[in-house]
Amino acid sequence: HLILASALICALVVCTFAEEQVNVPFLPDEREVKCIGWQEYCRGNLPCCDDCVMCECNIMGQNCRCNHPRITSECGSRR
């Protein structure tokens, strides 16, 4: 059972990693948004998108997409 569970976990990890590698075409204006990872709230200790509160990027921090426009100036241009 342990071997079967390990194989299942490995398959899941491989599938998840392969899914991350898919390049989804974004609109040109969305492609310019830069951020690292996914964050819901901008804090001083997290990378923050200039124009977004929530951003989604691929594993390399590129092809970022803004999901929610910034409503307040909470984010500013913090890096």
From Swiss-Prot:
UniProtKB keywords: Disulfide bond, Knottin, Neurotoxin, Secreted, Signal, Toxin
GO cellular component, one term: extracellular region
S-S pairs: C35-C49, C42-C55, C48-C66, C52-C75, C57-C64
Secretion signal span: 1-18
Predominant cellular place of this UniProt entry's protein: secreted
Tissue: Expressed by the venom gland.
Any Pfam family: Toxin_9
Family: Belongs to the neurotoxin 02 (plectoxin) family. 02 (plectoxin) subfamily.
Domain remark text: The presence of a 'disulfide through disulfide knot' structurally defines this protein as a knottin.
Keyword Transmembrane recorded: no
Name of protein: U1-plectoxin-Pt1c
A molecular function GO annotation: toxin activity
Localization per Swiss-Prot or TrEMBL: Secreted
InterPro entries, alphabetized: Spidertoxin
Keyword flag Signal: yes
Function: Potent toxin that may paralyze and/or kill insect pests such as H.virescens (lepidoptera), S.exigua (beet armyworm) and M.sexta (tobacco hornworm).
Propeptide: 19-31, 78-79
